[in-house]
């Protein structure tokens, strides 16, 4: 993994992308669940 042919390592891109996706999904599900709980 020390072979960084590009400017940004692939593992770094994957980690950042995963964190962003998980964060967006968490916010989306939390908002939908809290919205459903308040409406019901």
Curated annotation (Swiss-Prot):
Keywords: Chloroplast, Membrane, Photosynthesis, Photosystem II, Plastid, Reaction center, Thylakoid, Transmembrane, Transmembrane helix. It comes from the Eukaryota. Gene3D superfamilies: 6.10.250.2070. It is a single-pass membrane protein. GO terms for biological process: photosynthesis. It is found in: Plastid, Chloroplast thylakoid membrane. The chain crosses the membrane at residues 8-28. PSII is composed of 1 copy each of membrane proteins PsbA, PsbB, PsbC, PsbD, PsbE, PsbF, PsbH, PsbI, PsbJ, PsbK, PsbL, PsbM, PsbT, PsbX, PsbY, PsbZ, Psb30/Ycf12, at least 3 peripheral proteins of the oxygen-evolving complex and a large number of cofactors. It forms dimeric complexes. HAMAP family: PSII_PsbJ. Belongs to the PsbJ family. One of the components of the core complex of photosystem II (PSII). PSII is a light-driven water:plastoquinone oxidoreductase that uses light energy to abstract electrons from H(2)O, generating O(2) and a proton gradient subsequently used for ATP formation. It consists of a core antenna complex that captures photons, and an electron transfer chain that converts photonic excitation into a charge separation. This is Photosystem II reaction center protein J. It comes from Pinus thunbergii.
